[in-house]
Amino acid sequence: MKKIIELQNIKRNFQVGDETVHALRGISFTIYEGEFVTIMGTSGSGKSTLLNTLGCLDTPTSGEYLLDGVSVRTMSKPQRAVLRNRKIGFVFQNYNLLPKTTAVENVELPLMYNSFVSASERRKRAIESLIAVGLGDRLEHKSNQMSGGQMQRVATVSYTHLTLP
């Protein structure tokens, strides 16, 4: 099976005043294609730090992180942003929808960073995807006009198959 994510002795330290906080202490694991993984732990155990690392939002202090065989730790922020846009989808707890934009516009946003997708294709994909998840009647609604479940579907659509070239 193909390795999708591989972490080798990942450590992440933060400096808080005079104190060094060791958020991740030598995390190692591999996730193979087709596997589903759950990250669990008590408050303050490093779950968010680990997820931010896996999502290319943060870099480890030391260790090796390979995403689809590509070393992530030494990449620049712009390189990580491109990798994140092409390989990773997020559904945040608060959905991170832009409040003054419509469902279609929120779904289109991640594709704006994909130079292979034209504006008309981006809009077409967004509309088709929202219809597919039962939101055809909410295309032009803003987030404050949708239920929590509807917002979650908008967020899920925007960060899954739509980012593919």
PLM regions with names:
Residues 2-164:
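ABC family nucleotide-binding domain
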